[in-house]
Amino acid sequence: MHDELSLDGISVSRNGRNLLENIRIDIIRGKKIAVTGPSGSGKSTLMKLLVSDDESIGRIDNIILDGKPVDATDISSLFAYSSQYPVVLADTLWFNLTLGRKIGKQRVMDVCKSLDLDDIVREKGFDYVLSADGTGLSGGQLARIELARAVLSERPILLLDEINASLDSRTDMDIHHYLWNSNLTFIEIIHHYKKEDLKNYDAVIDVSDYS
């Protein structure tokens, strides 16, 4: 696990128009960063830029990983992405969680319990086969499956894009208590939140300051 990633001079664009300019993000292991701002301001595009290195949606001028300059192509593998539009595969629940990697069953069960997925595991089992469109599961269940997959990926940094969009308030709070109190490193786009929730993050980036 890397200790620190600094991204400086981040610009985000859409259809040739700059949305955000000159953002700096310092990501330190174990820290939690919230990203706020109005709808359509470029928050999700910012996340996509980090995982894709797509020059058509923006650029990052300077990238420093553990004190050494690196290229954008060197950092995409550091991130695991979980969004408000979860993607599932036409395969077993186990494969959707692990993507075929060798992960101990207890580790998978522990993450499922932390993310309120243990009820699905008890009811359907890990051999339950999902359809590609998620038929038979709620939006909240699909979102939690994708989030669990991201956590189990063991990627150093999670990118969380409005993961609570389809969660009820109790599940949302349970999951966030787990995330806030974990040793996970993540950047999270938050839209509907209480002001007091911000104290659970080590840094808050309001993209309105960079538009």
What does each model-identified segment do?
Residues 5, 20-22:
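Conserved structural motif at the start of ABC-family nucleotide-binding domains
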Residues 50-52:
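Helix-to-loop junction immediately C-terminal to a conserved catalytic motif
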Residues 61-78, 131, 173:
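ABC ATPase NBD Q-loop/coupling interface
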Residues 26-29, 74:
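Conserved hydrophobic segment flanking the Walker A/P-loop of ABC-type ATPase nucleotide-binding domains
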Residues 44:
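Walker A/P-loop
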Residues 86-129:
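Conserved "ABC signature" C-loop
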Residues 36-38:
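The feature captures the beta-strand-to-loop junction immediately N-terminal to the Walker
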Residues 96, 129-211:
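ABC-family ATPase nucleotide-binding domain "signature/switch" substructure
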